[in-house]
Amino acid sequence: MAFLILLRHGKSVWNEKNLFTGWVDIPLSQKGIDEAILAGQVIKDLPIDCIFTSSLVRSLMTALLAMTHHSSKKVPYIIHDAPQQKQMSRIYSEEEQHMIPLYRSSALNERMYGELQGKNKQETAEQFGEEQVKLWRRSYKIAPPKGESLYDTGQRTIPYFQETIFPLLQNSKNVFISAHGNSLRSLIMDIEKLSEEEVLSLELPTGKPLVYLWTGHTFERRPEPFG
């Protein structure tokens, strides 16, 4: 058995400005920082063996801030993919026992919003019409101009989860994923076997952890309080 913790990053500066963010690398706002710390307090007693984030800073900030309150007192350290960086950041002491590896991947990035990125959501609705913007945002396979649909997002998140993260859970490793609303929705669709209609109604608030227990056969959603 193993725990899987999913956390949508805290509010970003652009979330608060009501702008489409997507792959634009925007940091957390002060409210987002507070949300990340509070989320860490909620999951502080759950075992965590490894952490995964997207390549975007708001995802990384959320994970690092959340872990400052973990009861294990272990420190996250980033595992670099580049061979030279990987070798140069190697730990040669017992201190490694007090650390938790953190892996970053663009496969977990937010849905890419294409030509909507940086635009105000309300102004976009006024420009293109509310129905068109609703289709771009809430349909399963319709993408905004030069952007991704939720389906497209799942085409990178789900294989990464199945090939890289799921084997860890099968080996009883407890995993914490800090990512984004749409990348996590696509993962939850796979984990909970949701239909296209069901996933479209799924809302994930910022800074609110979801916890699953992998039983060896299935994922079970755990109620709060966790631990």
Swiss-Prot record:
Belongs to the phosphoglycerate mutase family. BPG-dependent PGAM subfamily. GO terms for biological process: gluconeogenesis; glycolytic process. Catalyzes the interconversion of 2-phosphoglycerate and 3-phosphoglycerate. Pathway: Carbohydrate degradation; glycolysis; pyruvate from D-glyceraldehyde 3-phosphate: step 3/5. Substrate binds at residues 8-15, 21-22, 58, 110-113, 121, 137-138, 181-182. Keywords: Gluconeogenesis, Glycolysis, Isomerase. The record marks H180 as: Transition state stabilizer. NCBIfam families: PRK01112.1 (NF002217). This is 2,3-bisphosphoglycerate-dependent phosphoglycerate mutase. It comes from the Bacteria. Its EC number is 5.4.2.11. The active site is at H9 (tele-phosphohistidine intermediate), E110 (proton donor/acceptor).
